[in-house]
Curated annotation (Swiss-Prot):
Designated name of the protein: Cyclic di-GMP phosphodiesterase CdgJ
EC numbers on record: 3.1.4.52
Keyword field: c-di-GMP, Hydrolase
Domain EAL: 1-232
Molecular function via GO: cyclic-guanylate-specific phosphodiesterase activity
Length: 432
């Protein structure tokens, strides 16, 4: 009789999974040109935005937009571009990007901030340069042509890049000799070095670094990256996995996307029966709900957000597994994971939601080793619990009974929790 009931209430069986990256991955292009020292050892690369395999900057592209895309696609995606991850990267920043402190989104030990030659030496730019220098960022003046207005910037700049073709090799060498004779501690980089003779002349004049076709043309690198929306989702999942959630940071992340903010407030207002007032802000939700409940609401909103282009049943499945693990967290085996139980269930389908391997995803989340093992291999008590839930989804009643025996659970108690989790997930879907 029990088996007939389960068969009638069995939930949706997921379809065959698509290939990884099919829906959420995009192709990005970046050109890199090496920067070398006097011994011709590569010290880093200048990164140049490209929108295709043609090795040229697209004429239609605004410089600020190009910088933003280069950063998002190569640094802020799910995993830094592996072809640039171990090198110091020289990145061009236009005036607006510097004023907005865009370089602060990147690790200071990995980049050199190039102040683009189109920048005007305004007070706003000077304040930005001062702050970046105080925060430990290396700064370079790109295609530098001296004018007194730039003099106050020089103490905060470590590298001065000079286009020896535009300035003229003799004039460039004379300028560098003069500055070094005055005691300048700046390092000078010769750009557009195209012959061995130019390299030797620039080196003897006092240039420290070199870049140009004589060493290497810019190399196009093509890779796949995850959409910015999914980057925000992973950042939020990382935050709610922490034992002590930084809700100030969570609020900032949620505020980056209007659709996500709306989903969160909709969840809070729809599902919180005991709140008599309408919740209109994240801070208000935190006050009324407390951290534990808000952790769950954020998880629900993010899962809904990233599953908008997926079958609704997949989102329903993520809710069902999350709620089942939450209900089972009261049992002895899982008390140590009570705070993360909901997330463990939800993360068991995260690979399907993001079209990315579970191995790659769990390494980016601050989870205990036994949780990672359960999600990757379905091993340990948590892995057995997830296996049990999956057997229920597939109407594998023999598997359900076997896993109940392994965990020491009463079959009827587990059945009730499974049905309750299924009912709860369906109710949530109806509410939203």
């Amino acid at each position: 009789m029990v088996r007939c009931l389960w068969a009638a209430e069995c939930c949706w069986l997921p379809p065959k999974r698509k290939q990884p990256f099919e829906d959420t991955m995009y192709t990005t292009y970046v050109a890199r040109q090496p920067i070398l020292n006097a011994k011709r050892h590569t010290l880093g690369y200048e990164l140049l935005f490209r929108d295709g395999e043609k090795n040229a900057f697209p004429e239609y592209m605004d410089a600020d937009r190009a910088t933003y895309r280069l950063i998002v696609e190569n640094f802020l995606s799910l995993g830094t571009n592996p072809r640039i991850a171990r090198s110091r990267c020289f990145i061009n920043f236009p005036h607006k990007s510097l004023i907005r402190r865009l370089p602060l989104t990147l690790p200071r030990e990995q980049i050199v901030v190039e102040i683009l030659e189109t920048c005007q030496p305004t007070d706003d730019l000077f304040e930005a340069v001062q702050e970046l220098s105080q925060r430990g960022y290396l700064l370079a003046l790109d295609d530098f042509v001296y004018s007194p207005a730039w003099e106050r910037f020089l103490p905060y700049v470590q590298i001065v890049k000079i286009d020896i073709m535009a300035m003229g090799l003799d004039k460039a060498c004379e300028f560098v000799r003069g500055r070094l004779a005055q005691g300048s501690r700046r390092r000078f980089l010769a750009e557009r070095v195209e012959t061995e003779d130019e390299f030797h002349q620039a080196r003897h004049a006092g240039f420290t670094f070199f870049q140009g076709y004589f060493f290497s043309k810019p190399e196009i690198i093509k890779q796949r990256y995850v959409s910015p929306e999914h980057v925000i989702a992973m950042q939020l999942f990382r935050e709610v996995c922490q034992p002590e959630v930084d809700y100030v940071r969570v609020e900032r992340l949620v505020a980056q996307d209007i659709a996500l903010s709306y989903k969160l407030l909709r969840f809070v207002n729809t599902m919180s029966d005991r709140i008599s007032v309408s919740i209109s802000s994240f801070r208000q939700a935190l006050v009324y709900l407390g951290q534990d409940k808000l952790r769950i609401f954020v998880s629900l909103a993010v899962a809904s957000y990233i599953s908008s282009k997926k079958p609704k049943e997949l989102y329903n499945l993520s809710l069902q597994r999350a709620q089942f693990c939450q209900l089972m967290a009261t049992h002895t085996h899982f008390k140590a994971h009570r705070e993360q139980a909901f997330l463990i269930g939800m993360f068991s389908v995260l690979d399907a939601l993001l079209d990315t391997s579970i191995e790659q995803l769990v390494e980016q989340l601050p989870l205990a080793d036994d949780v990672k093992l359960a999600l990757r291999e379905r091993e340990g008590p948590l892995g057995t619990l997830l296996d049990l839930e999956e057997c229920f989804e597939k109407a594998d009643w023999q598997g359900v009974e076997q896993h109940c025996l392994e965990l020491g659970f009463d079959l009827e108690d587990v059945r009730q929790e499974l049905i309750e989790a299924q009912r709860w997930s369906q109710d949530i879907n109806r509410l939203i």
